[in-house]
């Protein structure tokens, strides 16, 4: 009976730790810093992520903060879709093993000098305990 209890405890710990194992990683840096002139545009600033598991995953992202000036014209793209503005969140299209996806932003400052930061929390839908913060810092001169 003691052996069975020990095995059950060991099995429950292994399930807990197995689910916390990362299924994706950030390719390169999780922080992008961009600088541009007020009469120019930021065509794309992209942060890539990669599925490092052996099965397909669905990454969820949420906007944690957004301090971009309201005058700036912004949009963002995720793996599988683009949206006007900086939405509150969404889900990537399926990422197969070893496949990369991304979050990207586009900024047209409309001659408005300033700076702003947008941060996205990203995690696997099946493993929300493991997450990363992707940060875009933009300065318009």
Predicted regions and their residues:
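Hydrophobic beta-strand positions in extracellular immunoglobulin-like domains
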Residues: 48-49, 63, 107, 122
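Short, surface-exposed loop/turn segments at beta-strand-coil junctions that are enriched for proline
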Residues: 108-113
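Short Pro-Gly-centered flexible turn/kink motifs
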Residues: 43-45, 93-106
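C-terminal edge beta-strand
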Residues: 131-140
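Bacterial Sec-dependent N-terminal signal peptides
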Residues: 1-23
């Amino acid at each position: 009976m003691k052996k069975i209890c020990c095995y059950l405890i060991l099995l429950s710990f292994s399930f807990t730790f197995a689910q916390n194992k990362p299924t994706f990683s950030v390719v390169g840096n999780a922080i992008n810093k961009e600088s541009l002139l007020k009469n120019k545009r930021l065509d794309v600033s992209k942060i890539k992520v990669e599925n490092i598991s052996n099965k397909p995953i669905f990454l969820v992202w949420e906007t944690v903060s957004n301090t971009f000036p309201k005058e700036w014209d912004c949009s963002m793209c995720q793996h599988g879709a683009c949206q006007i503005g900086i939405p509150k969140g969404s889900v990537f299209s399926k990422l197969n093993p070893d496949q990369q996806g991304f979050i990207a932003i586009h900024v047209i400052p409309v001659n408005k000098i300033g700076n702003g930061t947008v941060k996205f929390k990203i995690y696997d839908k099946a493993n929300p305990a493991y997450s990363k913060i992707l940060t875009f810092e933009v300065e318009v001169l």
